[in-house]
């Protein structure tokens, strides 16, 4: 089967690699550097499994800048373009998705379009009405950055949307796509759910908001424990051994961040509109309170020091271990709070060559020099290369994992 994938981020590329094991896949991107890397068997993103598969597996995959040619020949078109949250309108910016839909429909009269981008509840219905077609369906992704292909190979569930009154072809394509994902997976007995588009859209936003809730819960627990001088590790362990709660996703942090949780929680809150709720709003608020609390704790530690020059060293901007981006990283908001108090900030981030021009922080990418300059070293996730200056480190990383 010929499949086109719009977007070579971790969602689009991982799906492209997965499906190219048994199908002919063309990745469409607007960046020549990404296209060149994929065509040379290199991954433009950090993902161990994607890197290995591109290098070692027999894949039928190519990348192109020529979107029209790719879409024209495709039987299925997967859309995995960004939908960043627009704080001005308090809604996802879906313009990239809509642009692809319009372009595909202009050159292809038969392909079914499968949206993998995270979208607002009701978006598929809106697009079907706007473009007067039922050939637009939704399949939410549940992937982690840096482990996207692994999560596609071992999925927790597969969800594809379809409506009762859809044409036989669209119904067949929805089932076919679900089967493609299931047959490419290494995990056996993966649950497959076919549901309405609005239900599928809701699953995605509510799932990520629950994860954000869990992060916020253990962060608030940790805030209480640190404030009352309790052993947070012991309290969390004592709670988490209850099978109903579980010993997972319970490691305190500076706040939830990354590409998905911040924007998805805000979008779900926006979707509630006039529907009664308090919990969803509280999750978003809790994350902001946590970051303010962390900044205050750092300031308190600084004030206890006698040094006339007080420098906060931020070790890594990445949100998670082994990540390769800083999108919505909680530490960035903590830095902004500290800078508003005229505190000098130095940053160790080997993935950066320079900071943005308006940034008042200083990039120090010699680790030993960084350690010497900083009065306190702040890190969301602890790393063993800080072991020799452990007495300088402030972190709420209790379990040494994400």
UniProtKB/Swiss-Prot annotation:
Active site: 260
Molecular function GO terms recorded: NAD binding; UDP-glucose 6-dehydrogenase activity
Binding site for substrate: 141-145, 204, 208, 249-253, 257, 320
Domain of life the protein comes from: Bacteria
Organism whose genome encodes this protein: Streptococcus pyogenes serotype M3 (strain ATCC BAA-595 / MGAS315)
Group of enzyme by EC: oxidoreductase
Pathway: Nucleotide-sugar biosynthesis; UDP-alpha-D-glucuronate biosynthesis; UDP-alpha-D-glucuronate from UDP-alpha-D-glucose: step 1/1
Job of this protein: Catalyzes the formation of UDP-glucuronic acid which is required for capsular hyaluronic acid synthesis.
Cross-referenced Gene3D superfamilies: N-(1-d-carboxylethyl)-l-norvaline Dehydrogenase, domain 2, NAD(P)-binding Rossmann-like Domain
Enzyme Commission numbers on file: 1.1.1.22
Membership in a protein family: Belongs to the UDP-glucose/GDP-mannose dehydrogenase family.
Pfam families noted in UniProt: UDPG_MGDP_dh, UDPG_MGDP_dh_C, UDPG_MGDP_dh_N
Sites where the protein binds NAD(+): 2-19, 29, 34, 83, 118, 145, 259, 263, 327
GO annotation terms (biological process): polysaccharide biosynthetic process; UDP-glucuronate biosynthetic process
Annotated catalysed reactions: UDP-alpha-D-glucose + 2 NAD(+) + H2O = UDP-alpha-D-glucuronate + 2 NADH + 3 H(+)
UniProt xrefs under InterPro entries: 6-PGluconate_DH-like_C_sf, 6PGD_dom2, NAD(P)-bd_dom_sf, UDP-Glc/GDP-Man, UDP-Glc/GDP-Man_DH_C, UDP-Glc/GDP-Man_DH_C_sf, UDP-Glc/GDP-Man_DH_dimer, UDP-Glc/GDP-Man_DH_N
Keywords noted in UniProt: Capsule biogenesis/degradation, NAD, Oxidoreductase
Protein name as catalogued: UDP-glucose 6-dehydrogenase
């Amino acid at each position: 089967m010929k499949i086109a994938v719009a977007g070579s981020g971790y969602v689009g590329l991982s799906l492209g690699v997965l499906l190219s094991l048994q199908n002919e896949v063309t990745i469409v991107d607007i960046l020549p550097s990404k296209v060149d890397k994929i065509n040379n068997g290199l991954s433009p993103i950090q993902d161990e499994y994607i890197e290995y598969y591109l290098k070692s597996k027999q894949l039928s995959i190519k990348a192109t800048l020529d979107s029209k040619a790719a879409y024209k020949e495709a039987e299925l078109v997967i859309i995995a373009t960004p939908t960043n949250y627009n704080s001005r309108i308090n809604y996802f910016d879906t313009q990239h998705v809509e642009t692809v839909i319009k372009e595909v429909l202009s050159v292809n009269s038969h392909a079914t379009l499968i949206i993998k981008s995270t979208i607002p509840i009701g978006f598929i219905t809106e697009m079907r009405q706007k473009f007067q077609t039922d050939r637009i369906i939704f399949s939410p992704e549940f992937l982690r950055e840096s482990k996207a292909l692994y999560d596609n190979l071992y999925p927790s569930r597969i969800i594809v949307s379809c409506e009762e009154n859809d044409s036989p072809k669209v119904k067949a394509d929805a089932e076919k796509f679900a089967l493609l994902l299931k047959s490419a997976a290494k995990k056996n007995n993966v649950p497959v759910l076919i549901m309405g588009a609005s239900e599928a859209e809701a699953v995605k936003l509510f799932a990520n908001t629950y994860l954000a809730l869990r992060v916020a819960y253990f962060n608030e627990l940790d805030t209480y424990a640190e404030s009352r001088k309790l052993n947070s590790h012991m309290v969390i362990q004592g709670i988490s051994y209850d099978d109903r709660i579980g010993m997972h996703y319970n490691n305190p942090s500076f706040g939830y961040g990354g590409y998905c949780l911040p924007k998805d929680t805000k979008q779900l809150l926006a979707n509630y509109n006039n529907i009664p709720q308090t919990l969803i709003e509280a999750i978003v608020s809790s994350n902001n309170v946590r970051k303010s609390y962390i900044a205050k704790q750092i300031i308190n530690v600084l004030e206890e020091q006698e040094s006339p020059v007080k420098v906060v060293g931020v070790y890594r901007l990445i949100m998670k271990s082994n990540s390769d981006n800083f999108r919505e990283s909680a530490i960035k908001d903590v830095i902004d709070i500290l800078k508003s108090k005229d505190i000098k900030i130095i940053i160790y981030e080997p993935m950066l060559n320079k900071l943005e021009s308006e940034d008042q922080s200083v990039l120090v990418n010699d680790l030993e020099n960084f350690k010497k300059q900083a009065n306190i070293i702040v890190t969301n996730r602890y790393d063993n290369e800080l072991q020799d200056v452990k007495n300088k480190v402030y972190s709420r990383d209790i379990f040494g994992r994400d």
